[in-house]
């Protein structure tokens, strides 16, 4: 069998597996670090901080990258610092047949945290995760997939799903913003990269919850424990959970196991926002917004992505959307 034919068959198999839906949340196990399926019938209302602890990590340490010593310059691939650092490589699984991120995992060390402190890596070119855009033919405005868009960019266009909404701070102040951010799977504060394979289209609430919720619950727990105990390292993985062929993850399964055993848990972080009806199938919100003008085309949302992430720690959500938002 030729290499070309073999690669073609592999792509078909990957896409086929991605299309199957499981109608109930599967029991958690950590034999593989891959995207998982999750039920569309979940009830999230009881999880006001957008996460729940579901058990121990069940992490197989032998499946994780090894810790090693190198220089900061070599590890970061830039700069001139020859400082010796103890690190691990972070593994970013490839996008699946629907161009969705499928997981990231690695071992977090004190040096990885220190190198990330006070520094935000710029996002790679075209980092927007699945569900961020919708794609259309220019000739007839027929909706197409991202793969089809990639194959004929001069004859198609894309429209952002991330429409403006009204959000509310913990102090009750309302302001205009966007509901979605490019949410890191492996947190940049823990050494994760700002690349598409390490991001999902997540709500601001999924990203930070309230002051203690969302992805920040487990991220801050790991960061704090390592900062206080510099010799400790943490096995860490984040796996998005999709329903069938939906482009937006319903949740993210995050597991953490510290070398001293103090941290040993798996949390499910919900990609939801009370008061908003999210379109998980295609991205955006479930409101009527037919495509009528190509003037709405948005070729880059990098600023939106960069400015939305850690600056929103105090953001909570509206209990209801306004009439203006619905229209």
Swiss-Prot record:
Residues 299-327 are annotated as: Disordered. It holds the Pfam family Endonuclea_NS_2. Its EC number is 3.1.21.1. It is an enzyme of class 3 (hydrolase). Keywords: Endonuclease, Hydrolase, Nuclease, Signal, Virulence. Disulfide bonds: none annotated. Residues 1-24 form the signal peptide. It catalyses: Endonucleolytic cleavage to 5'-phosphodinucleotide and 5'-phosphooligonucleotide end-products. Gene3D superfamilies: Extracellular Endonuclease, subunit A. It comes from the Bacteria. GO terms for molecular function: deoxyribonuclease I activity; metal ion binding; nucleic acid binding. May have a role in S.equisimilis virulence. This is Deoxyribonuclease.
